[in-house]
Amino acid sequence: MAGSELEGMKMEQSRERFANEVDVALAQPASPFAIRNARKVDARGVAEHYWLVSDGDAIVAVGDRDADFAAACASVGLNADADSVGSVGSDSSAAGSVTDAAGRMMTPGYVDIHAHGSWGSSFDDGVQGIRLARAGHMMHGTTRQVLSLITNPLDVMCANLETVHGMMSARPDILGAHLEGPFLALSRKGAHDPECLKDPVPEYVDRLLQAAGGCLRQITIAPELPHGIDAIRRFAAAGVVPAVGHCDADYATARKGFDAGAGIMTHMFNAMNGLHHREPGPIPAAVEDPRVTIELINDGFHVQNPMVRLGFGFAPHRTAFVTDAMAATDCPDGHYLLGALDVDVIDGHARLVSNGAIAGSTLTLEKAVQRAVLELGFTPADAVEAATLTPAKAFGFDRANPVTKQPLGLLAPGYAADVLLLDPATWSVTHVWCDARPLR
């Protein structure tokens, strides 16, 4: 066996092992845990010498006074004495432990509301594909994720929705599904199969809603399609957040879409008509509307750095970093599939074999936050907010809700115990807790 084949086999085994560990951990009851001596970074700002305590259900206390930390630990049955505290260099993330972060940054878990896969698997690939792809993103700090499903024949999309629905009860990290298609403009289809694109007539809307069984969180729709505005109203009435994207809509039509109930712009700048002083298009319509969350792929390829800074500045507290990550994320260059379409990944950039169209990214939210701070000059609080609180707000997950129970996106009492520790120099994720379960 060649050395490269052996290395590939070892990598597959390692990733399957981590996916199994995630499965087991999320299936077990959570235990109290605490973290101290961290640099807290969330949407509310930065704080030094910070600590956090969870009772195994939610965050119950935070602060920067040592005496308060000991009392908070005692209230959930933990011992804050020095002899019982593990350091980040030890096996300190065991359930029920008290961890000394040794000055590492502590952030909420990242929330990705638009991603298709990772680790060689797509969210369209059934239970096994979802397990592996979610493990890949979990490894890099994405504790909660909306699973994006690519355009396929309607029967296939319905079956994929049913799979996501079936996994949600056992997987608190899965927030639901996002349908990117099939109601997209042919002229802005990007890496979607043109043979599967449709006008969103009521029959198709009803079929997808029925198959989803309540798991559908968002759906991208080109509002200029004949039934586009009506479909936006129908999905919004059913509790789904429609997104304007993959469209050729003018400014007025995009405004109609948002007024009809669309609450998201799918990856701003990509797969839509751009900014023009006499033909403003959909972007200003989204920027002007305080109800709209704006997705942005901060990889420097989908959107180059000057436009990332400009776009974020349009609506800094409404712009959510998303990855649009496909199966090749965190994998070597090579040949992959996006739905039924062939994709070549070269230098980490995914393009369709057929016409060279960009075919998703190989980005993680870990990398998006790193780029924002270390390359683009974002403040730490702004960068973290774009990967935590802002995407959570798009679906009301920033407050108590039936899906996540506790709100997401802040390190504050009452919020979900989704916590990351990061290397302060590189912003690389080193430790992960999801729903109070230690996963890395």
Regions flagged by a language model, labelled:
Residues D206, Q210-C331:
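Active-site core of metal-dependent hydrolases
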Residues A34, G109-V111, A243, F321-V322, ...:
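Residue-level marker for buried hydrophobic side chains located in beta-strands
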Residues R104-M105, I113, F123-D173, C196-A211, ...:
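Alpha-helical scaffold segments that flank or form the walls of functional sites
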Residues H116, R131-N160, D173-A185, A212-E224, ...:
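Divalent metal-dependent hydrolysis catalytic cores, especially in the metallo-beta-lactamase
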Residues G3-N79, V85-S90, T426:
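N-terminal metal-binding scaffold of metallo-dependent hydrolase/deaminase domains
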